[in-house]
Design a protein with these regions (language model features):
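Glycan-processing catalytic domains of CAZymes
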Residues: 40-363
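C-terminal segment of N-terminal export signals and the immediately downstream linker at the start
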Residues: 1, 22-51
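Hydrophobic h-region of N-terminal signal peptides that target proteins for export
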Residues: 16-22
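N-terminal secretory signal peptides and thylakoid transit peptides that target proteins
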Residues: 1-15
């Protein structure tokens, strides 16, 4: 603390002298560049919370086929740099959030193109797997989303198309790439949903059967007060699920899927920060009961802002990751690095979040 005060005092003297007598400053041997560097570096001491007291992010979604996030139009050079930036902060797992949404797809799929999907310009699946191989990361493949679940509320609509996609992808890609490490069942739910248990079970079982038992996971949201439509103007809603009801419904869901779904990464952005511990404790207890891993999907975008969506304030991210550590979660992944945390994101705040994260975790 004494060193910090001394450095800051010297920096103040330098600044004042520069205004009053710049020639003197330039010639002075006592006030030099090293003093200024040390004084500025001492500003790091302004962090007042305990560092590294949170669960670090070790995985990220790759949101190349998005519902509601603007496309960055990156090519392989930008993606290569982004994988390098991920690796630099300890990310070892990348998850393609979905292999397609309605008619837009990520790879040259004979089945989906035959059903009317557009042929993609680039084989993004091959590119992501190649980069994951290069940077020694684990790659999880996200299943296809036809959009019919969102239209009907019945998740079983997604089973048939994914029977073909799972087989096609494993034969064409998974068996060739060392990084292909598992499957993401991409249907998102929050409550007891029509067809959810059957759909998760059928798709999870097929993923495991074709790949020799590679792990699967899901990433539902919690139906909290921030669970509002992204297309609407409201930031919160009156009706939100209670902790007890959340536990009851997810106990039933886990009971029906735990033999073919290995992990659950609940999205953390739909509840308030003072609710994190209560919901996280329930999530971990349920996962332990059914022998599943409990991950957190730590959202790096801010649901509290009227502009949808911008990078989150670091303090909010810290609160969520600290709660995950207190609950004993197994892993933290994020939605998602490339838009909201990357130094090369279209949002300048994302690079600042990256730097604050590195400071906190002393990377």
């Amino acid at each position: 603390m004494g060193d910090r005060r001394r450095f800051l005092k010297e920096l103040a003297m330098v600044s004042a002298a520069a205004v009053v007598a710049p020639d003197i400053v330039a010639k002075s041997s006592n006030v030099n560049e090293k003093t200024v560097r040390e004084a500025v570096r001492a500003a790091d001491d302004f962090m007042i919370v305990e560092r590294k007291n949170a669960l670090p992010i070790t995985g990220t979604f790759l949101d190349e086929i998005s519902h509601d996030i603007p496309h960055q139009n990156w090519g392989v050079q930008q993606w290569d740099a982004d994988f390098r930036n991920m690796k630099a902060i300890g990310i070892d797992t990348v998850i393609m959030i979905r292999s397609g949404y309605r008619k837009f797809i990520t790879y040259d799929s004979p089945y989906l193109i035959g059903k009317g999907c557009y042929r993609p310009t680039y084989d993004l699946l091959e590119m992501f797997l190649t980069l994951a191989d290069k940077y020694d990361m684990k790659f999880y493949f996200g299943l296809y989303d036809s959009g019919r679940y969102w239209d009907t509320g019945d998740l079983t609509w997604e089973i048939e198309d994914n029977k073909h996609v799972i087989e096609e992808v494993w034969q064409g890609y998974g068996s060739r790439h060392k990084s292909f490490a598992g499957w993401y069942i991409s249907g998102e739910i929050s409550r007891a949903t029509r067809g959810a248990i059957r759909a998760f079970h059928d798709m999870g079982k097929q993923c495991k059967d074709v790949s020799g038992g590679l792990p699967t996971f899901i990433s539902p949201w919690i139906d909290g007060k921030k669970a509002v439509m992204a297309s609407g103007s409201a930031l919160t809603k009156e009706e939100a699920v209670s902790v007890a009801q959340h536990e009851k419904e997810w106990d039933e869901i886990f009971d029906g899927i735990h033999d073919v779904v290995d992990a659950c990464a609940f999205q953390d952005g739909h509840i308030d920060y003072d609710e994190l511990d209560a919901f996280f404790e329930v999530n971990k207890r349920l996962a332990d009961r059914y022998g599943m891993q409990c991950w957190t999907n730590a959202e790096t975008f801010d649901r509290d802002m009227p502009i949808k969506f911008l990078p989150i304030k670091f303090e909010k991210l810290r609160l969520k990751l600290e709660a995950a550590k207190r609950a004993g979660y197994d892993k933290a992944i994020t939605f998602e690095f490339s838009h909201f945390m990357s130094p090369q994101s279209a949002y300048i705040q994302a690079g600042n979040l990256y730097n604050r994260y590195k400071e906190y975790f002393e990377i």
